Amino acid sequence: MVGNEGRLIVLDAGSGMRALGANVEAAEQVDVLITHLHMDHIQGLPFFAPLHDPDVRVDVWGPISTTQTLSERLNRYLSPPLFPLRVRDLSNVVFHDVPPGTFEIDGIQVTADLVSHPGPTLGYRLEENGKVLTYLPDHEPALGMHNFPKNPEWTSGYGLASGADLLIHDSQYTDEEYSERVGWGHSSYSHLLAFAAMTGCRTLMTFHHDPDHSDQKLDEAHERLRATGPEFEIVAGTHGAVLDV
């Protein structure tokens, strides 16, 4: 996400960080918003080129913990023998422990809140000039196929996603797959549609696809999702996709 004056905001730090870092145009400031510290969301961080450039300030934001700071927790991965450098060796990096609440990045209002997923996990809502992007990549809005909440105020993530222009949301499981994985912290297709409809979002980008799903299976799934006739646009999250919010 590009903010004011080209300031870059990156949502999570998965394997795409290496390619992103190699193609980032000159920027003096990068902000990385981490939802949680599961490996698929942080494994690309040490390979992000701006992290090692003393002329670029990188602010890393992530969920607060009662036991260790964000930098201490990331240092368990960013240190030998898993990686040759330690967090303290990074040249111009600032870590922020994020509690539920609202803060500002270069005029963009960022709201963070805990969502339903194993371990401390944040969702993010970014607002600027009346436009809203909500990012909920790992999110189980209801437990069980028949327990979707009727009251929005009691639904995990609703406050972050309400009225979003772009909702980027977990879409890992088919309903059949989810029935055997209740409580794993990911969404079924039915819950995905119900949650998006509840929020009144304008565009839904499906995200966090199951790595065992082939491109053909994903294409077929998205045909079925669109065939339900939702009041919002459905866009499949793909590598290199560019959207205007």
Residue ranges and their predicted role:
Residues M1-P137, A142-M145, G157-Y158, L218-V245:
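Binuclear metal-dependent hydrolase catalytic cores
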Residues E140-V235:
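Cap/insert and terminal regions of metallo-dependent hydrolase folds
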